[in-house]
């Protein structure tokens, strides 16, 4: 990873690409994600909350960054997400050989399909839920984060830290959203990466079949 892939990116270019994307987020609050595989998701965001500093530039004392860096992300407004989400790239630290289908109502995953991997997901999140108070248990299924990969050298290889940074992908994380200001404090946070998605913010298309349609 340190000599090729996402770590080999020109992070000045990554920073520029993320900065150029920022103006397209202004005053847009409805996100719609679709794919040919069946994803059809709509949710709201507070456009002022987009995180645009995961760019790999870490040149001042006490600055922190992901390795590899390169994503733009936000917390979906709680309770607003509805639809079907098909994860087809990777989940956590595994490349997928079978898609995962998530049914989402009011920001909460209510059903998971997709063979063995889906059964494992249900078990893992179920075990975490058992440790919570009964009124908090469904919060483990909160859709906690949404973002775009912005690193043109990142590759899809089953390492979630790199997979979610691959340019043209988007990702959704399930579980704890407190790091982004949310109320779901559940101690689990796992991302799934989509390839080939179409994404709109209000009536402005951002991704078409996994490629940016904007000049960034």
PLM segments and residue spans:
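Active-site bordering "gate/hinge" segments
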Residues: 1-97, 105, 200, 204-209, ...
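Histidine- and/or cysteine-centered catalytic micro-motif in compact active-site loops
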Residues: 46, 88-90, 105, 114-117, ...
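Intrinsically disordered terminal and processing segments
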Residues: 169-216
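Hydrophobic/aromatic beta-strand elements that line small-molecule binding cavities or substrate pockets
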Residues: 102
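Short loop/turn microsegments at loop-to-beta-strand junctions
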Residues: 97-99, 195
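Dual-mode signal for accessory low-complexity, basic/Gly-rich regions
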Residues: 95-96, 111-174
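A short, structural micro-pattern
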Residues: 37, 79, 140, 164-168, ...
């Amino acid at each position: 990873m340190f000599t090729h892939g996402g770590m080999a990116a020109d992070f000045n270019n990554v920073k520029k690409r993320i900065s150029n994307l920022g103006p397209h987020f202004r005053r847009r609050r409805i996100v719609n994600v679709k794919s040919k595989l069946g994803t059809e998701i709509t949710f709201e965001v507070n456009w002022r909350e987009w995180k645009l500093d995961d760019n790999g530039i870490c040149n001042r004392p006490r600055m922190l960054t992901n390795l590899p860096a390169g994503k733009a992300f936000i917390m979906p407004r709680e309770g607003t997400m509805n639809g079907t989400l098909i994860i087809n790239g990777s989940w956590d630290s595994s490349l997928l050989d079978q898609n995962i289908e998530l049914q989402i109502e009011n920001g909460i995953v209510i059903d998971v399909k997709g063979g063995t991997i889906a059964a494992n997901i249900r078990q893992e999140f179920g075990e975490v839920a058992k440790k919570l108070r009964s009124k908090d248990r469904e919060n483990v299924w909160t859709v906690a984060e949404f973002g775009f990969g912005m690193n043109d050298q990142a590759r899809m290889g089953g390492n979630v830290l790199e997979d979610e940074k691959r340019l043209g992908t988007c990702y959704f994380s399930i579980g704890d959203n407190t790091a982004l200001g949310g109320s779901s404090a559940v101690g689990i946070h796992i991302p799934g990466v989509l390839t080939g998605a179409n994404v709109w913010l209000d009536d402005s298309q951002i991704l078409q079949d996994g490629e940016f349609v904007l000049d960034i």
